[in-house]
Regions:
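Short carbohydrate-recognition loop motifs
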Residues: 76-91
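Extracellular ligand-binding interfaces
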Residues: 87-156, 174, 182-185
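Short beta-strand-plus-loop segments that form exposed binding edges in beta-rich domains
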Residues: 167-174
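Alpha-helical tetratricopeptide repeat
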Residues: 19-34
Length: 187
């Protein structure tokens, strides 16, 4: 019985060491991305670290810190009062062209809630009077929580090379409530 207990203890310690190493790797990668101002990538690593449920609050604190940085560096507020967008409907938000010197470091910050009972994709398109400059897709999870989406739009060539004046959101196969949408920049 003692041998079995010792084996179980060793196995448990090995599992804890593996989780600890994985957590430390995610935190290290998140911190590197944070220092490089790649906030979207930093959040991915911090989210993975938080999902390990180690009891540490650091990953959540860093995600909140990034969200605060982005909100403090807001360039354009596109949604401040909640709006709903029905499935497969498109809603366009207009703004003045962003200063060319800050475009490469731009993010779109969206706080949104899934109003449907399934996960789905949402298309984010952007452009100007000349037409559509580009688009990307984000996954909307199957939960009814308000989720933060931080999209590094400045990494897209047509975002920083064109004078874009609108962003469109199109939820595909699900309804969504947008509580906040801003164009922001890393500090």
């Amino acid at each position: 019985a003692t041998q079995g207990l010792n084996n179980a203890t060793q196995l448990n310690e090995a599992k804890l060491a593996a989780v600890s190493a994985e957590y430390n790797q995610y935190i290290s990668n998140g911190d590197i991305q944070f220092e490089s101002k790649n906030y979207d990538k930093a959040i991915e690593y911090y989210t993975k670290a938080a999902a390990l449920e180690t009891g540490y609050t650091y990953p959540t604190e860093m995600i909140n810190r990034i969200s605060t940085i982005l909100q403090e560096n807001r360039l354009e507020q596109l949604v401040s009062n909640s709006i709903q967008i029905s499935s497969n409907q498109t809603k366009r938000f207009t703004f003045n062209p962003i200063d060319v010197t800050t475009r490469k470091n731009n993010y779109i910050l969206i706080k949104a809630k899934n109003l449907s009972e399934n996960s789905y994709t949402m298309f984010i398109s952007y452009g100007s009077a000349k037409g559509n400059s580009g688009s990307l897709i984000i996954r909307i999870p199957n939960n009814q929580d308000v989720n933060d989406y931080i999209i590094r739009i400045g990494a897209q060539y047509k975002w920083f090379s064109e004078d874009n004046t609108w962003i469109e959101l199109t939820p595909e196969n699900g309804n969504i409530e947008i509580e906040l949408m801003e164009i922001t920049k890393g500090n």
